[in-house]
Amino acid sequence: MASPQEHSGPTTQPRGVPPVIAVVGPTGSGKSDLAVALALELDGEVINADAMQFYRGMDIGTAKITAEERRGVPHHLLDTLDVTEEASVSDFQWEARATIAEIHGRGKRAILAGGSGLYVRAALDVLEFPGTDPGIRRRLEEELDDAGLATLRRRLEAVDPVSAARLGDARRVVRALEVFELTGRAFSSFMPVREYYQPAVQIGLEVDRELLKDRLAQRVHGMVANGLQAEVQRLDAAGLRHGKTASRALGYSQFLKVLDGEWDTGQATEDTIVATRKFARRQLTWFRADPRIHWFDWQDPDLVAKALAVCR
């Protein structure tokens, strides 16, 4: 993904375009399948909003939708990064909004699908990402080393008391001061608001948590049986462990430990299951906080029809 250093993406759309659709929910809940079903009914195209599915070669461990599962529906923003590249939510915002505009320009419906909550909000909501300045950052980090966190926090309190009260660690205090020096605006002024940048509708998949726990365990075991360790080994040769984002992906970080001789396959599998379940709980907490989402039972036989009713 390539974009200007500082941007908030395209912020206007032609009048009369249909609402963007976003299918959200925890991992393993069936978002990809529902997005494809909606696309087939609405003449739509799907935009990936799962940060780990940006990576080429990370297929098994991310449950990336296969060509067969796409059922002829065009998919965008899959396989856009090498594992050594860092995923950027601001870059995604730019790419996603440009892709939405292109899809609408073809007279099609744009359908986001993914469980990376901040990425979904970046595409849908009024959300700005201030740029960075390595020189300012370096100077502030040197001041942190010389004068200490308390000194930088007092400076932040003078220009942005909201951030000073909210941010606890040194890295974030440095970032808040960097943003103020770079933009003249308080870092807190860039915080997201629940306001769509263009019309949108979000479809959430309501899950039975116990059933989801079982499904996630089965899915991880299936990934291992289908060659997850070999996939991690191939990607390690391509620099996986040096990628700040990709190396932290569920399953991949665990099986790197297998390659290093720290864990056996069983340990890596069980840790991946536990970590995936925790991740699903965090996703549910994130999406549940958004009152705009229309929730539907993931196992409802009329799921597609009910989702279509709020999308048309």
UniProtKB/Swiss-Prot annotation:
Transmembrane segments: none annotated. The record marks S116, R137 as: Interaction with substrate tRNA. The keyword tRNA processing applies. One of its GO terms (biological process) is tRNA modification. It catalyses: adenosine(37) in tRNA + dimethylallyl diphosphate = N(6)-dimethylallyladenosine(37) in tRNA + diphosphate. Substrate binds at T27, G28, S29, G30, K31, S32. Catalyzes the transfer of a dimethylallyl group onto the adenine at position 37 in tRNAs that read codons beginning with uridine, leading to the formation of N6-(dimethylallyl)adenosine (i(6)A). Its EC number is 2.5.1.75. ATP binds at G25, P26, T27, G28, S29, G30, K31, S32. HAMAP family: IPP_trans. The keyword tRNA processing applies. This is tRNA dimethylallyltransferase. InterPro entries: Dimethylallyltransferase (IPR039657), IPT (IPR018022), P-loop_NTPase (IPR027417). GO terms for molecular function: ATP binding; tRNA dimethylallyltransferase activity. Its cofactor is Mg(2+). Monomer. Belongs to the IPP transferase family. Keywords: ATP-binding, Magnesium, Nucleotide-binding, Transferase, tRNA processing.
